[in-house]
């Protein structure tokens, strides 16, 4: 409001229309959509990087037989590379979801105080085509397709958009948690492990340990991310009529931390997938120990 007042002092004739029907949501909601699009693009780039590393690993170890597990019990042989494709496939599904969110993301545009565009109808003397032209112009200026503006809104864009986006991010968390959990189990079997730095020690009391701390951190952050989905879900369900302000504080925390958690997870994934360690002799030993039982039927 202080800015509007200051501009009005400098431009008295425009004081009555300089903020006509804009509301803080005109600035805030459109900005949020732009920022989330940029965030999704950054997530997409890192996700593709992780997939490239997993694809390389899968190709390298596609012919190395190992034991597959169902119910965490020895089942039938598979290969180390084939198992890696399970991890990669779920991340591809996440990439497709991110792409869908980017392709369908729309700006709020100019909708006025309650979504009726009444103030803009007044400004343009009832010329609806001019309002549509303003919406298209804003979308184009912000790097969106001129038609990528929500058709209807209240004071805010639908908070289902936030729920959709955070669900897509949580999907990445799910996939990364599955990968990290598998790797933690394989580290216990001593078949595979995450990279272990030159000067890294297991713990102050037990320096000989090889704790899978990166994968543990992935799981911890992923758990937070998956629970964070509840926030925009409840916000959407409790958005009274054209809007309530109790969405604001929650949204600012939930969406920002959801993106930050996803970014942190993918950073760790890039590190882990770049240096996966396989112990072929242990892999073969465990396979051979179980193989007689798998061919006995």
Which role fits each region the language model picked out?
Residues 1-118, 124-141, 202-203, 213-217, ...:
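A helix-coil-helix interface module used to build multimeric assemblies
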Residues 190-191, 203-297:
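Glycine-rich cofactor/substrate-binding loops
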Residues 3, 39, 43-50, 80-87, ...:
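Amphipathic alpha-helix face/heptad-repeat signature
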Residues 29, 72, 156, 242-243:
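Short, charged/polar, low-complexity loop and linker segments
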Residues 126-229:
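Acidic, glycine-rich loop-and-beta core segments that form the ion-binding/anion-interacting portion
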